[in-house]
Curated annotation (Swiss-Prot):
Organism: Mus musculus (Mouse)
Extracellular topology ranges: 1-7, 80-84, 156-176, 255-264
Membrane topology: Multi-pass membrane protein
Protein name listed in UniProt: G-protein coupled receptor 65
Domain statement: A multitude of proton-sensing residues, which include extracellular histidine (His-12, His-16 and His-245) residues or triad of buried acidic residues (Asp-62, Glu-144, Asp-286), contribute to activation of the G-protein coupled receptor activity and pH sensitivity.
One Pfam family matching this protein: 7tm_1
Mutant lacking the gene: phenotype: Mutant mice are healthy with no signs of spontaneous colitis or inflammation, however are more susceptible to bacteria-induced colitis in comparison to the wild type.
Keyword Kinase among record annotations: no
The keyword Transmembrane helix appears for this protein: yes
Tissue: Detected in thymus and at low levels in spleen.
GO biological process: apoptotic process
Location(s), subcellular: Cell membrane; Early endosome membrane; Late endosome membrane
Record topology, Cytoplasmic segments: 45-48, 121-128, 215-218, 294-337
Disulfide bonds listed in the record: C7-C162, C89-C172
Length: 337
């Protein structure tokens, strides 16, 4: 555990209430939503739909992050005091950033896949196979694990001595000011994990929009639905990830040569923390936008629910039959006696 000599006197009022509320809502909604999305995308992948591979990976990434939220809820409710082991801190930070940047990668793959399907339906068919999607998804998981593995080797906790009610309390990862290795890593992530995916998604969605708008065979109502979906996808990406990365860049510039006792950038750090909470909303938006708004996705989800209901009813029927037999046997035994 690394000891940080900086003394922060911030009272954590905003984070104490905002973060737990946001994280609790995201956890309650995103866990069942992403489990459902995993089921839907698995069914789509079984139907030789390469998009299902990307959706499955996206849902898995969101679910893994959502499962760490109870730890972050506890952390923020305790005024940024990490009460668990340093290993859990490292693991939580790893899955948090793994989700941020694997999500942007898988969203980019989905945008490219839809672009090729609409604009070049025959020309690049070899890029739209399950095999290619599986290899691409596996490569993303490996690369993201490699780039984020640095978080597992660094000391992600530091001790702060400014709360008069406590002898000390432990921070997890979000140190102020940023260390040099964090600045370099953040600049790399912002370029490769945010800027390039955002540009790619916007270009692909614009090309799809133009192709759909000029397609005479598509009904106007269907065109409007597709255009609204494209706009929602782009807007969600921008709202969830842009504020965070803007604040990351600002922090990298302001804190590059900042002394540990310099509190001039603390307001910026507070705004940055709010944008971190905002990124968690992506876990809720992804399954809704990518799995449950399409007719195929809704149909698959409905089939899953019917299957589960049928199994439940069959199980209840079996229990009633067993109970009936048991009661009849008991009556027969009483007669024999």
């Amino acid at each position: 555990m690394a000891m940080n000599s900086m003394c922060i006197e911030e009272q954590h009022h905003l984070e104490h209430y905002l973060f737990p509320v946001v994280y609790i809502i995201v956890f309650i909604v995103s866990v069942p939503a992403n489990i459902g999305s995993l089921c839907v995308s698995f069914l789509q992948a079984k139907k030789e739909n390469e998009l299902g591979i990307y959706l499955f990976s996206l849902s898995l990434s969101d679910l893994l992050y959502a499962l760490t939220l109870p730890l972050w809820i506890n952390y923020t409710w305790n005024k940024d005091n990490w009460t668990f082991s340093p290993t859990l801190c490292k693991g939580s930070v790893f899955f948090t950033y793994m989700n941020f940047y694997s999500s942007t990668a898988f969203l980019t793959c989905i945008a490219l896949d839809r672009y090729l399907a609409v604009v070049y339906p025959l020309k690049f068919s070899f890029l739209r196979t399950r095999r290619f999607a599986f290899i691409t998804s596996l490569s993303i998981w490996i690369l993201e694990s490699f780039f984020n593995s640095m978080l597992l080797w660094k000391d992600e906790t530091s001790v702060e001595y400014c709360d008069s009610d406590k002898s000390n309390f432990t921070l997890c990862y979000d140190k102020y000011p940023l260390e040099k290795w964090q600045i370099n890593l953040n600049l790399f992530r912002t370029c490769m994990g945010y800027a390039i995916p955002l540009i790619t998604i916007m270009i692909c969605n614009h090309k799809v929009y133009r192709a759909v708008r000029h397609n005479q065979a598509t009904e106007n109502s269907e065109k409007r639905r597709i255009i609204k979906l494209l706009a929602s996808i782009t807007l969600t990406f921008v709202l969830c990830f842009t504020p965070f990365h803007v604040m990351v860049l600002i922090r990298c510039v302001l804190e590059r040569d900042m002394n540990v006792n310099d509190k001039s950038g603390w307001q910026t750090f507070t705004v940055y923390r709010v944008t971190v909470a905002l990124t968690s909303l992506n876990c809720v938006a992804d399954p809704i936008l990518y799995c449950f708004v399409t007719e195929t996705g809704r149909a698959d989800m409905w089939n899953i629910l019917k299957l589960c209901t049928r199994k439940h009813n069959r199980h209840q029927g079996q229990k009633r039959d067993i109970l009936s037999v048991s009661t009849r046997d008991a009556v027969e035994l009483e007669i024999i006696d």
